[in-house]
Each structure stands twice: as C-alpha cells, then as structure tokens.
C-alpha cells in the first residue's frame, strides 16, 4: 500500500491494465472464450485514459464487466478474474480501485493454480505469492519522487 500512494493514477491504472490483460484475461477466457466484456472494459478504460472516449462510455463497459462477474457466480476463477479486471478498469476514475486487482486477482490466480477446494492455507500462500508478483510489476514501472501522486482515500 505504501508504494501505491506514491504513484500517479495513470501509473497505477496502466499497471493494472497490463497485469489484467496479461494474467487475468486468459483466466476469464479459459471459461468464457466468447465473453468479451472484461476485455471491452480494459479497452474502454485505456481509451478514456488516453482521452479518446468520455467517462460515461467507459463506465458503461466497466459496469458490464462487473455484470459478467456476477453472472459467473458458480465459477470462482472466472468470477474473481472478472471482478479484478473490473476493479482494474475502474482505476481510471478512482485510484483506490487498484487494490481490487490484488484482492480479486490474487484469489483468481490461486484458485486456478490449486483448485477452489484446496486448503485455505495453501490458497492464502499462493495468493500472497501473486500479490508479491503484482508489487514487483508496480516497482518496475514506479516513478521515484512522482510529482503527481494519486490522492487515495482508503475509506477505512
């Protein structure tokens, strides 16, 4: 969390988009190969961040990703992947959504690797390993002494 608050919203968003596209979209696609909503949400978020579309259009596609997650209620991996992607895409309008990538994304990866019925301790350990990978990815793109850090209110 300490590194998150030192980075700009665009750095946080781009890192979340990249990770989601590389790691989580394939997990979603494994179960829903014809389900475009998570990919559409990431595309819309990138377009909004670059100024090509307005927030309401991006928000509509992001909300569709969240709907896809709800519809995948019986598939823990796909549901968690779609939730993480939706949170990643939502980082464009509120930087604090970037934490959803770690929460849902690590769970998706752990459940995919070990199965949803794996012992909780093993799932937690695998999720922690994935969170460390996410942190390493952020470290790679982080800007030391970022002049415009995101103003994140964690609401807790």
Short names for language-model regions:
Residues 1-124:
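Structured binding/interaction patches within domain cores
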Residues 111-156:
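C-terminal binding/interaction regions
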